[in-house]
From Swiss-Prot:
Quaternary organization: Part of the 30S ribosomal subunit. Contacts proteins S4 and S8.
A GO BP annotation: translation
PANTHER family: MITOCHONDRIAL RIBOSOMAL PROTEIN S5
CC terms in the record's Gene Ontology section: small ribosomal subunit
Molecular function as annotated in GO: rRNA binding; structural constituent of ribosome
Record carries keyword RNA-binding: yes
Record keywords, A-Z: Ribonucleoprotein, Ribosomal protein, RNA-binding, rRNA-binding
This protein's name: Small ribosomal subunit protein uS5
Family the UniProt entry places it in: Belongs to the universal ribosomal protein uS5 family.
HAMAP family documented for this protein: Ribosomal_uS5_B
Species of origin: Cronobacter sakazakii (strain ATCC BAA-894)
Pfam families hit by this protein: Ribosomal_S5, Ribosomal_S5_C
InterPro entries: Ribosomal_Su5_D2-typ_SF, Ribosomal_uS5, Ribosomal_uS5_bac-type, Ribosomal_uS5_C, Ribosomal_uS5_N, Ribosomal_uS5_N_CS, Ribsml_uS5_D2-typ_fold_subgr
Function, in words: With S4 and S12 plays an important role in translational accuracy.
């Protein structure tokens, strides 16, 4: 599993996985490459992309472009999560919970890359079930997208933020 990090303007880009895939035809096999990347601004915006091409650099480029187009906003709370969240995609399930200052990102592989570029600095996370990088990334982003800030919950319930936080 390759990890490449670049700064593109204000966006952090990370390469999570490159995979060689083949198509069998009458004359033999045709090989191509897939790339899984995540991009984020380190301040709550994150997206992932999956690109496929005959050459590795082209696959990475396609994945980066798709990641930039598919970004979501995540409501962070001083570098950690608002509350414990679960995310799922196909066979992968992830659980993430906020952690105190100085804990760091305790997460594995693909989940760590997503959390780093999203701007999360302290989190405890665990992946269950399938650890296929694509599914783990999708499950992580699903969990982050489902996280609600106290302001959002208060607005939905028609209460003040103080009432929500107790």
């Amino acid at each position: 599993m390759a990890h490449i990090e670049k700064q593109a303007g204000e966006l952090q880009e990370k390469l999570i996985a490159v995979n060689r895939v083949s198509k069998t035809v009458k004359g033999g096999r045709i090989f191509s490459f897939t790339a899984l990347t995540v991009v984020g601004d380190g301040n709550g915006r994150v997206g992932f992309g999956y690109g496929k091409a005959r050459e590795v650099p082209a696959a990475i480029q396609k994945a980066m472009e798709k990641a930039r187009r598919n970004m979501i906003n995540v409501a962070l709370n001083h570098g950690t999560l608002q509350h414990p969240v679960k995310g799922a995609h196909t066979g992968s399930r992830v659980f993430m919970q906020p952690a105190s200052e100085g804990t760091g990102i305790i997460a594995g592989g693909a989940m760590r890359a997503v959390l780093e570029v999203a701007g999360v600095h302290n989190v405890l996370a665990k992946a269950y079930g399938s650890t296929n990088p694509i599914n783990v990334v999708r499950a992580t982003i699903d969990g982050l997208a489902n996280m609600k800030s106290p302001e959002m919950v208060a607005a939905k319930r028609g209460k003040s933020v103080e009432e929500i936080l107790g």
